[in-house]
Amino acid sequence: MFAIVHMSDVVRIPPNRLTHSLNDAALQILKEKYESMISPEVGYVIMITDADPSSIGKLVAGDGATYHKVTFKALAFYPKLQEIIEGEVVEITDFGAFVRIGPTDALLHLSQITDDYLKSDVKQGVIVANQTARSLKIGSKIRARITAVSLGKGAGMGKIGITCRQPFLGAVEWVADEIKKA
């Protein structure tokens, strides 16, 4: 789920940035620190949208920088368990597919695609069901449910697991076929 989150921090504005406006300097420093970061509290920080630094800062002896409290807004993506998401298949492997959801990729394991037996062809970039002949290939749009979320700290990649083994989940074409049958 995408959200605008309100955060606060203390930023160190070095002497070479004091020629810029306080707001611009603080915003640039926050972008360098937070954008592309993963936090267990807010999820994937995509971008900093607004910063409001305190005009009163602190000086530390021996350091030419000023320290300012700042409140800011960030656009974040926080994957929630059981959430239904839509994404695009970006990679096919011998154990499943990676699906782009927001700023990251989620793993769709072979056992979580469908109840049918599956054959994965990595060279062709396709997964084919044996009985129904349904296929999942790079570029396919899918609808899935998030079943596992593990967000690390810092810039490390989090891990997200998804499933399509429920009614009205899977490739968009599969869902359209199920709706016609219902």
Question: Where would I find each of the regions flagged by the language model?
Answer:
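Single-stranded RNA-binding regions, centering on S1/OB-family and related RNA-binding modules
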Residues: 1-182
